[in-house]
Amino acid sequence: LTEFFWPLLYYIKQQILLGNGIPLWNTMFFSGTPLLPDPQNLFIYPLNIIFLILPIDAGILTSILLHLIIAFFGMYQLLRANDTSKKVGIIIAILYSLSPKLFSYIEAGHLGLIQSWAFIPWVYWATINLCRKKNLKSILLLSLFLYLVYSSHILIFAILVVTNFLLFLTFKKNAIVMFLISHIILLLFSLPILIP
């Protein structure tokens, strides 16, 4: 966290605040590295706007807390969508949002993994919601949650796409069309990252 993410956050924030816009090249490592196509790019994740508002240290703590809350509500929503009782939903959501795996990410300073972990249950909830309702709102929600995972950690995103596809296969055949539409919209969201 202090050797990779903190300096990058500081550099990006300073460049934006100085009026230089979003930096596309990181001059801090070696002879420089591109920032935009970096899979752990910090400024494409929408919730990282918090770092422009708060000091970086406070922003990191706030971001972690915010993602713990998002993880809790995501797991609770997923369980309630599957007819789990409120009490069991709350208990499992607490266990998920305070899981040792997530806290190992926090201790290691893996900001992208922390952020993506929060949206895993939301992706599955949106998938189930899309297979049941098959409407534009459900397609857009799934695309949004997949984009949030994509913009925070690419490996978790890849795993989610595969498992999401397998989940779609358990529903009716026309659900595959919804899967494809949601992923085309996701691709459109991701074009600014993929084009350079």
Where are these regions (language model features)?
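Membrane-interface coil-to-helix junctions
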Residues: 1-72, 94-117
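Membrane-embedded helix bundles of polyisoprenyl
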Residues: 70-81, 86-171, 179-196
